[in-house]
């Protein structure tokens, strides 16, 4: 399946404790259907001390399912994403609400 949400996209969280917050996607995991969004879904993890790293409790982003985030368009509103094939055969992402091309 083609990736509707990609690295670098600005997204808004639709459900959960971070509902309504926006952030930038910095990693997408297509096999799991999840993404990591900067500053969203933060969890605390106990880190064991190593030679390179100090031990203690660290805060990091946990994966969030792609169905729980929506792309934020140029107008600042969440929108669904579709695909359109251009005349030269190139496939581009399109915002469903406005019809504006996202990339390409």
UniProtKB/Swiss-Prot annotation:
Part of the 50S ribosomal subunit. One of two assembly initiator proteins, it binds directly to the 5'-end of the 23S rRNA, where it nucleates assembly of the 50S subunit. One of the proteins that surrounds the polypeptide exit tunnel on the outside of the subunit. PANTHER family: MITOCHONDRIAL RIBOSOMAL PROTEIN L24. One of its GO terms (biological process) is translation. The lineage of its organism: Bacteria, Pseudomonadati, Pseudomonadota, Alphaproteobacteria, Hyphomicrobiales. The gene is rplX. NCBIfam families: rplX_bact. GO terms for molecular function: rRNA binding; structural constituent of ribosome. GO terms for cellular component: ribonucleoprotein complex; ribosome. Pfam families: KOW, ribosomal_L24. Belongs to the universal ribosomal protein uL24 family. Gene3D superfamilies: 2.30.30.30. Keywords: Ribonucleoprotein, Ribosomal protein, RNA-binding, rRNA-binding. This is Large ribosomal subunit protein uL24. Signal peptide: none annotated.
